[in-house]
Swiss-Prot record:
Family designation: Belongs to the purine/pyrimidine phosphoribosyltransferase family. GfcR subfamily.
GO biological process: pyrimidine nucleobase biosynthetic process; regulation of gene expression; UMP biosynthetic process
GO MF annotation, one: orotate phosphoribosyltransferase activity
NCBIfam families (alphabetical): PRK02277.1
Organism, as annotated: Methanospirillum hungatei JF-1 (strain ATCC 27890 / DSM 864 / NBRC 100397 / JF-1)
InterPro entries listed in its UniProt record: GfcR-like, PRibTrfase_dom, PRTase-like
Highest taxon listed in the record's lineage: Archaea
Name of the protein in its database record: Transcriptional regulator GfcR
PANTHER family membership: OROTATE PHOSPHORIBOSYLTRANSFERASE, PYRE-LIKE PROTEIN
Free-text comment about domains: Contains an N-terminal DNA-binding winged helix-turn-helix domain and a C-terminal regulatory domain (or effector binding domain) resembling phosphoribosyltransferase (PRT) domain.
Alphabetic keyword roster: DNA-binding, Transcription, Transcription regulation
């Protein structure tokens, strides 16, 4: 998928399948603003400035996904060799979950799952941890996702972790569209930084 028309078609298809705009944004690795535009744009309207990342060649292949999780772990350990040892890897739904699971298995620690507000319904959506894959006060947490588009979701997760008495020690992502080094003092480690040159 590379053309704008294909992105519009894919966004509309996902919407017709019942996906929320937040879920579509995650599926296409685009900002919420871009997805809103894809779903509602008018002829002649200016196209938002965003970068589409299609990593389905990796995400759909289990061995490549394992290797990606290993690279994230290597990046974390190389950048923070003396850092606190994580007790839980929290995957952000949806694409952060398999990466966090594989990282947690390798490290022999627990997995947590966070459902961001953009996936929730209602008038005032809020994010939350899965009841079956929760965190506990005092635990050291690494947050894992596939793409940083705006940084809002990572900020939301870090705020949640701190409010519940746990300690976020790092964030690991495959792709960073914003060049974010840290969020509220929590270091962000990415494998790839993606920039748009206008």
């Amino acid at each position: 998928m590379s053309t704008l028309d294909e992105l519009i078609q894919k966004a509309r298809h996902l919407r017709s399948e019942g996906h929320s705009p937040g879920q579509i944004a995650d599926e296409l690795s685009l900002s919420m603003e871009t997805v809103t535009w894809l779903l509602t744009q008018e002829k002649g309207a200016a196209t938002p400035k965003d970068v589409h990342i299609d990593w389905t060649a990796v995400s759909g292949e289990s061995q490549l996904l394992v290797e990606s999780a290993q690279m994230l772990l290597s990046r974390l350990h190389l950048k923070n060799p003396e850092g606190p040892v994580p007790q839980v890897y929290v995957g952000i739904a949806i694409s952060g979950i398999p990466l966090a699971t594989l990282m947690a298995v390798t490290e022999g620690v627990r997995i947590g799952i966070y459902h961001p507000a953009k996936h929730a319904g209602g008038d005032e959506p809020i994010g939350s941890m899965s009841g079956n894959f929760d965190i506990h006060a005092g635990e050291r947490i690494v947050v894992v996702d596939d793409v940083i588009t705006s940084g809002k979701t990572l900020q939301e997760v870090i705020n949640y972790i701190k409010r519940h008495g746990a300690v976020p020690v790092a964030c690991c992502v495959l792709f960073d569209k914003r060049g974010i080094r840290d969020i509220d003092g929590v270091p962000v480690y990415s494998l790839f930084k993606v920039s748009r040159i206008d």
